[in-house]
Amino acid sequence: MATHLVLYNGAKMPILGLGTWKSPPGQVTEAVKTAIDLGYRHIDCAHVYQNENEVGVALQEKLKEQVVKREELFIVSKLWCTSHDKSLVKGACQKTLNDLKLDYLDLYLIHWPTGFKHGSEYFPLDAAGNVIPSDTDFLDTWEAMEGLVDEGLVKSIGVSNFNHLQIERILNKPGLKYKPAVNQIECHPYLTQEKLIQYCHSKGIVVTAYSPLGSPDRPWAKPEDPSLLEDPRIKAIADKHKKTTAQVLIRFPMQRNLVVIPKSVTPARIAENFQVFDFELSSEDMTTLLSYNRNWRVCALVSCASHKDYPFHAEF
């Protein structure tokens, strides 16, 4: 199993990274330090997670201790929806760099295709509880992203939560300078994303799978929601390989040539999640796991369903 995937521009992206969405600021510094000590080199961040400063403390410490060199790390962050206006993109990126205490990012993504009204709130809502959109077009946002590459602030740029029609709009943009290197999307056995992944791969775009464990700690979980980690069918595959369900759920996207970013702040689990290079799921296991698709999303961003750029009305 390759430990890296190569982006179209030649950059090498570690296939396994540490996710930091929902990692409490008080715990994420130790989590990132533990991960780096265990061999993780890819850390997935975002401004909206409100913990980049604490992630930065960990990165700074490990760089200072010379546990790792900067060029061995692959640090990802994301532009939040309230900064889609072309004039705001560079400042948003610089805020993230400042918080992470870095002078460049390896990958910077447009977090969602939907632009929101600029201001202090991450989700500006109207009286009816719908998100207030900005009058921006993500093609203009993309031009500003390209500028970050030219200025040396970021090595690669990409998107997240974009459907194939939205990616196609970027690829067909007149005067396109850099195509998206990555599309980061929710992906697991209940949301297998076969068509979107096939599309991205056909365009030379690497796909990162987020919420590979089904995000059991999501704040809006309901008791009747399906649970990947408690699915006896997946547990049976894990038992056969003498592995945990989580390890099977992490190995599954890797064998589909996806990058995967499981989140944990628990040292034992951060370690467990990295022990996935010493076994292989059979083609039968893979087919079985793919058959569990039910188009079930953790992150449906329902407050934005009426936004002109809401990504999940399209089939893929």
Curated annotation (Swiss-Prot):
Residues that coordinate or bind substrate: 111
GO CC annotation, single: cytoplasm
Source species, domain of life: Eukaryota
Top EC class for this record: oxidoreductase
Site residues (Lowers pKa of active site Tyr), renumbered to this chain: 78
Keyword field: Acetylation, Cytoplasm, Lipid metabolism, NADP, Oxidoreductase
Gene Ontology molecular function, alphabetical: aldose reductase (NADPH) activity; all-trans-retinol dehydrogenase (NADP+) activity; allyl-alcohol dehydrogenase activity; glycerol dehydrogenase (NADP+) activity; prostaglandin H2 endoperoxidase reductase activity; retinal dehydrogenase activity
Positions of post-translational N6-acetyllysine modification: 95, 222, 263
InterPro entries, per the entry: AKR, Aldo/ket_reductase_CS, NADP_OxRdtase_dom, NADP_OxRdtase_dom_sf
E.C. number(s) listed in UniProt: 1.1.1.21, 1.1.1.300, 1.1.1.372, 1.1.1.54
Residues the record lists as binding NADP(+): 10-19, 211-273
Pfam families reported for this sequence: Aldo_ket_red
Keyword Nucleotide-binding in record: no
GO BP: any one term: retinoid metabolic process
Record PTM N-acetylalanine, positions in chain: 2
TM regions (residue ranges): none
Active-site feature positions: 49 (proton donor)
Subcellular location: Cytoplasm
Reaction it catalyzes: an alditol + NADP(+) = an aldose + NADPH + H(+); all-trans-retinol + NADP(+) = all-trans-retinal + NADPH + H(+); 9-cis-retinol + NADP(+) = 9-cis-retinal + NADPH + H(+); 13-cis-retinol + NADP(+) = 13-cis-retinal + NADPH + H(+)
Family assignment from sequence similarity: Belongs to the aldo/keto reductase family.
Subunit structure of this chain's protein: Monomer.
Role this protein plays: Catalyzes the NADPH-dependent reduction of a wide variety of carbonyl-containing compounds to their corresponding alcohols with a broad range of catalytic efficiencies.
The protein, known as: Aldo-keto reductase family 1 member B1
Source organism (scientific name): Oryctolagus cuniculus
Name of the gene encoding the protein in the UniProt record: AKR1B1
